[in-house]
């Protein structure tokens, strides 16, 4: 049985709260000032959390905005699942910090760069190298601790 939209939104809010509680230090290791420039990592991290917490595999979506789309210029990444747009780094553009909606105002208006399911086996090396240290810093702040993503 699929989770409800409200359950997906609650999990996204939990994860964003954990990112905020972990503070800026984990992101500084990646030369990122969250949320600016963190959308790709944040989407991948949230995708793995949603898989473990709710059993859903969301798609990572990356698009380029050739023009200004509501403050978004250049590249942005977020998740999509079952018709939902899920974004936990929109505040870098002046949007809400957590967006979970079936009617996105800005998402989907750019040019598709890439789209793929999160947490794919062939991405494991990249994920642990790029997202592993962030996951380790964020995990203690999650209401449902997840010990193993393997």
Residue ranges and their predicted role:
Residues 1-150:
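A structural boundary/capping signal
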């Amino acid at each position: 049985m699929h989770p409800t939209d409200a359950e997906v939104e609650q999990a996204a809010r939990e994860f964003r709260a954990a990112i905020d509680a972990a503070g800026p230090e984990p992101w500084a290791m990646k030369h990122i000032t969250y949320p600016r420039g963190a959308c790709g990592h944040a989407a991948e991290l949230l995708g793995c959390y949603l898989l473990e917490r709710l059993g859903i595999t969301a798609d990572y979506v990356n698009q380029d905005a050739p023009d200004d789309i509501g403050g978004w210029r250049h590249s942005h990444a977020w998740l999509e699942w079952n018709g939902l747009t899920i974004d936990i780094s929109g505040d870098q553009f002046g949007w809400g910090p957590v967006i979970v909606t079936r009617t996105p105002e800005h998402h989907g208006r750019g040019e598709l760069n890439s789209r793929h399911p999160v947490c794919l086996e062939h991405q494991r090396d990249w994920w642990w190298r790029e997202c592993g240290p962030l996951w380790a810093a964020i995990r203690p702040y999650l209401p449902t601790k997840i010990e193993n993503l393997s």
